Amino acid sequence: MASNLVEMFNAALNWVTMILESPSARVVLFGVPIRGHFFVEGLLGVVIIILLTRKSYKPPKRPLTEQEIDELCDEWVPEPLIPPITEDMKHEPPVLESAAGPHTTVNGKDVVNFASANYLGLIGHEKLLESCTSALEKYGVGSCGPRGFYGTIDVHLDCETRISKFLGTPDSILYSYGLSTMFSTIPCFCKKGDVIVADEGVHWGIQNGLQLSRSTIVYFKHNDMESLRITLEKIMTKYKRSKNLRRYIVAEAVYQNSGQIAPLDEIVKLKEKYRFRVILDESNSFGVLGRSGRGLAEHHSVPIEKIDVVTAAMGHALATEGGFCTGNARIIDYQRLSSSGYVFSASLPPYLASAAITAIDVIDQNPDMLVKLKQNVALLWKGLSDIKGMSLTSNRESPIVFLKLEKSSGSAKDDLLLLEKMADRALKEDSLLVVSSKRSFLDKCRLPVGIKLYVSAGHSESDLLKASESLKRLASELLLKS
């Protein structure tokens, strides 16, 4: 049977070959001989055109039966709306029942509060409350729109002017939410193809801004200027031929995750040597560092013009809400058109802008608050200097006092559980509210976890001694026995 098929195929092939090679299959058109294979190719072209112009075949539609619908529904397994709850997520933080001042109320009990960044003790300040009340009576609660439409009110412009005057910069811009300031400002200036060199210890808001920028991100070791220099050197070597490459250094003045203070003078020297721009977040230094609270530039005696972009949240030292960015007029004007947090968000409620103006006035008129804050930081450092099982790793002038475990278990999760147990006992046994440096799974910071204490000018000497004694007792009971 197979041999018969082969013979039939060969016979058909010979017949086609004979037809195509016969003299009758050759045509002369305008002096050009047309052979048989041209005929076949033309025929194929016609077939292709017919196939392309035909309507596609659509199988007849048949609605599913009730039984088929039920079977599909039974087989469907929906994805969970949220990720599964892990053991470390079950820890419930304490809930404040009053304002987050130096003392607050938790579970109906008065506690000493070292968990709020109320550095100057302005939460509940009489002048700020009066300012908020008068602004509410004049403007109402909200601004009812973004700044570029109908959300700009005179108090917003007054606040921007007051910030610029306080810091000695040409212009400023307000944001309605402190955290959004950094993750709107960074993508505003940094785009795909740019290079950003960032400290590995920056907080989550900055990390989010770096991700949204879609730039090439390179991290250097936390607060290590030699690591920064080597990183900048490598980038300049790698992109030597890229003439229009935009390059940025991103850092915090006081690092929220460690309490370290950035050496701005050295950063500026490296910036000028390698021709980078600097974006600096002063959320934890504005109103705190420097002789008059003007931040890291004053602290290191560096002209503020050396910093290209300065941002800060106003929810810390100023005891209000929102954030700002300050710098030269071109930097600020560009954000008014291109920064998503400014363009698309409702503007800062007027009463909060009014409170910020009043807070800056209070700082200007009461330099003794800064002196008191520095004294409190020094007193807490002295009290915790001999704590067993933990070590102080923050800067001595930082308002964030950071206690790190001397002996880690090797697992950040286990270390965190131990620190949370310590914080829970401090609250229950000594009415002391402190926090561990808990981070979400989205946070890329890999610095060691620890206990953070936010020092306030409103803390009394007895508050600081109470914190020192409580933590030393708990450290000896929990850490030395484990």
Curated annotation (Swiss-Prot):
Q: Which cofactor does it need?
A: pyridoxal 5'-phosphate
- Carries keyword Signal? no
Task: State a single Pfam family of this protein.
Answer: Aminotran_1_2
Task: Give its E.C. classification number.
Answer: 2.3.1.50
Entry GO CC = endoplasmic reticulum; endoplasmic reticulum membrane
* BP GO terms, sorted: embryo development ending in seed dormancy; multidimensional cell growth; regulation of programmed cell death; sphingolipid biosynthetic process
Q: Where does the record place it?
A: Endoplasmic reticulum membrane
Q: Where are the transmembrane segments?
A: 32-52
Q: Which UniProt keywords apply?
A: Acyltransferase, Apoptosis, Endoplasmic reticulum, Lipid metabolism, Membrane, Pyridoxal phosphate, Sphingolipid metabolism, Transferase, Transmembrane, Transmembrane helix
A molecular function (GO) term: pyridoxal phosphate binding
State the phenotype upon gene disruption. Defective Embryo and pollen lethality. RNAi mutants display plant size reduction, altered leaf morphology and increases in relative amounts of saturated sphingolipid long-chain bases.
Q: In which pathway does it act?
A: Lipid metabolism; sphingolipid metabolism
Under catalytic activity, the entry for this protein gives: L-serine + hexadecanoyl-CoA + H(+) = 3-oxosphinganine + CO2 + CoA
Superkingdom of this entry's organism?
Answer: Eukaryota
Q: In which tissues is it expressed?
A: Ubiquitous.
Q: How does it sit in the membrane?
A: Single-pass membrane protein
* Major place of residence: endoplasmic reticulum
Tell me, in a sentence or two, what this protein's role is.
Component of serine palmitoyltransferase (SPT), which catalyzes the committed step in the synthesis of sphingolipids, the condensation of serine with palmitoyl CoA to form the long chain base 3-ketosphinganine. The heterodimer formed with LCB2 constitutes the catalytic core. Involved in the regulation of the programmed cell death (PCD) signaling pathway. Plays an important role during male gametogenesis and embryogenesis.
Question: What other note does the entry give for this protein?
Answer: The fbr11-1 mutant is incapable of initiating programmed cell death (PCD) after induction by fumonisin B1 (FB1), a specific inhibitor of ceramide synthase.
According to the record's subunit comment, the protein's assembly and interactions are: Heterodimer with LCB2 (LCB2a or LCB2b). Component of the serine palmitoyltransferase (SPT) complex, composed of LCB1 and LCB2 (LCB2a or LCB2b).
UniProt lists the family membership as follows: Belongs to the class-II pyridoxal-phosphate-dependent aminotransferase family.
Put simply, this protein is called: Long chain base biosynthesis protein 1
Gene, per the UniProt record: LCB1
